[in-house]
């Protein structure tokens, strides 16, 4: 139920070709059910845009911050074999998080700062900005959640170790043995 602006696909394809990358994603506008703006820029609201501009192709960026929003993604079909299957057992790794990480490990990524999607925020979103931003009341809750999520994400990566380059497989093995 998100709204794609008419130029979304065309601009994504153009960026993919012009920047000679394997995968593009972009910012979006967060709106309510009546398309009224809640946040004009998801990237600004979540404090991601500055990080993205600094280190777009680092897997560490996608691992720590989950910068990729699924509905903004466009990638080359040759990468489907790398991202599939998407881990389904993990409660911590959702599809866009997984795709962003794998693409940053295996290919080149470009970011489109323009907003070609109106992301409709409601109770049925898989994650949603309200659940992310307004659910934390105390710093301890945030710290505890961060630790638990990263441990869960790491566990998912270990289970899918064959998707990663050899040097990262070795790092995963060392971390697991630690």
Question: Can you name each region flagged by the protein language model?
Answer:
Residues 1-135:
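Nucleotide-sugar donor-binding/catalytic module of glycosyltransferases
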């Amino acid at each position: 139920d998100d709204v794609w602006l008419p130029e979304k696909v065309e601009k994504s394809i153009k960026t993919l070709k012009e920047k000679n990358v394997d995968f593009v994603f972009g910012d979006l506008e967060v709106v309510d059910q009546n398309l009224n703006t809640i946040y004009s820029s998801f990237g600004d609201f979540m404090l991601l845009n500055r990080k993205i501009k600094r280190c777009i192709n680092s897997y560490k960026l996608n691992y720590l911050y989950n910068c990729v929003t699924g509905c903004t993604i466009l990638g080359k079909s040759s990468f489907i074999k790398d991202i599939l299957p998407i881990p389904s057992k993990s409660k911590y790794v959702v599809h866009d998080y997984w795709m962003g990480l794998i693409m940053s490990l295996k290919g080149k990524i470009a970011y489109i700062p323009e907003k070609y999607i109106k992301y409709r925020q409601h109770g049925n979103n898989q994650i949603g900005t309200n659940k992310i931003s307004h659910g934390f009341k105390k710093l301890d809750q945030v710290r505890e959640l961060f630790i638990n999520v990263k441990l869960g994400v790491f566990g998912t990566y270990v289970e899918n170790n064959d998707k990663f380059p050899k040097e990262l497989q070795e790092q995963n093995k060392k971390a697991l043995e630690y």
